[in-house]
């Protein structure tokens, strides 16, 4: 995925626009954050029913771009992968959700399109019993199904 598309997708996620579903709809119709931002001044040609809020958000992207540049620099420095929705690595099942995020961030080398995926969401204040339980659960799960992808919810 090219860095410009990643940067532009981060920009879209940082706009002061309160309808993520609307932004997702626009992204799916256009297929690229770069195309959206290149056509931001005439977005109604692409999306005739664009809301006034969307038009206002796209009219001023400077602050969102500054924040996105800082975020992308941080991601690159610390080896954090940014995956846009139009990237082949983006989880296909997640794309089917009406409220799928425009992008995901992760570290590692996991195939996010594994056949079997389990999400484990923990707590910020785990007890020793909970730590032991999840450690044994994950160990047993890996033996039963070695190809399972275990995703942390980062509670």
Predicted features and spans:
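Short, positively charged patches
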Residues: 1-139, 143
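Structural motif
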Residues: 85, 151-154
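Catalytic cores of nucleic-acid endonucleases
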Residues: 147
